[in-house]
Amino acid sequence: MSTPTKVVVVESKDCLLIAYSDGQEYNLPAEFLRVYSPGAEVRGHGEGNETLQFGKREVKISSLKQAGNYALQIVFNDGHDSGIYSWEYLQQLAENYDEKWARYLEEIHNAGLSRDQDAQVIKLM
């Protein structure tokens, strides 16, 4: 695990840029960070207690707050602010983005939910 050399919210507030000293750079969408928040309201209090997040397509990053020397608190415009993203967790999210994003899309599809806040998914037979 390494500490990023740069963490910036892009101007549109829908993405977090993370850079490391080895030259690696990652752009993590706000929606992705929100649905994979380490906060208890998302992760629950143990394995199998997760709450599937949906309707977060338009979520933005309102602000960042450093949590000691080991983590970042991300505040989202939907009011969510309880997730403390350790540098290690952010690196895991970045390195496994494709796999985690595909899994999330499959989970909301299987649950009949939408990434859009006001959408209602109707299954046709």
Please describe what each predicted stretch is.
Residues M1-M125:
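Motif-centric detector for short Cys/His coordination patterns
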